[in-house]
Amino acid sequence: MTRLHRKHRIALGLGLGLLLGFGGTTVQAAGDAALYEAVAPKGSTFVRLYNASNQEVSANVGSINLEDVSPLSSSGFEYLPAGQYSARVGSQNLPVNLSAEHYYTLVTQSGAAPLLVEEPAFKSKQKALLRVQNLSDKPLTLKTADGKTEVVKSVEPKGRGDREINPVKANLALFDGERKVADLKPISLARGEVVCLYVTGTANQLNPVWVKPPVKE
């Protein structure tokens, strides 16, 4: 092999190295940026919208827009700087004070003023969290569908109850004391996941809905 040919091979090798090495790193970085969401700045607060009404609703808080949330569905959590805001939920306004590193759900119901509900963070990677947000006017207990096992102890009206459990698929129901008042859709829980049961309405007509983070397309 001549010295000239060796130079050509070295140059070709360097060119391929740049293309497959550094170029690959650039492509990978771009892919990672598309795959992972931006990290919230330290001191941010987190808000989502749960729509307990029978029509599509949008909301905005500060710089974030929670748009076109379907009935009995929720948006994902969005972050913004902590502080005091006027939240616009549908056609109504709600003054809110959002603390740093806290999570909140704006709740809209037909014929009622919007509410701000706090959602304490859950950091376990081994367990799942079942949460009951009881916005009804009746104390309620979450049990297995057969009523034999209490899962979340009685939650007072406008109160919250939590229970860490192992990942599982479960058939559960709401009880008023020993009386079953609502069967719930089967629910699957994964490690590190928070699944929240929002109960709206009154004792005469309860509306329990499992609220999970929406699946992204």
UniProtKB/Swiss-Prot annotation:
Name the gene for this chain. Answer: algF
Q: What is the lineage of its organism?
A: Bacteria, Pseudomonadati, Pseudomonadota, Gammaproteobacteria, Pseudomonadales
Q: Which domain of life is it from?
A: Bacteria
Q: Does the keyword Electron transport apply?
A: no
- Describe the function of this protein: Together with AlgI and AlgJ, forms an inner membrane complex which probably interacts with the alginate polymerization-transport complex and adds acetyl groups at the O-2 and O-3 positions of mannuronate residues. Acetylation of alginate increases cyst resistance to desiccation.
The record's subcellular locations are: Periplasm
Organism, by scientific name, is: Azotobacter vinelandii
This protein's UniProt keywords = Alginate biosynthesis, Periplasm, Signal
The answer to whether keyword Signal applies is yes
List the GO cellular component terms: periplasmic space
Q: Which InterPro entries match?
A: AlgF
Pfam families on file = AlgF
Q: Name one GO biological process term.
A: alginic acid acetylation
Q: Which family does it belong to?
A: Belongs to the AlgF family.
First and last residue of the signal peptide: 1-29
Give, as in the UniProt entry, the pathway in which the protein acts: Glycan biosynthesis; alginate biosynthesis
What name does the UniProt record give this protein? Alginate biosynthesis protein AlgF
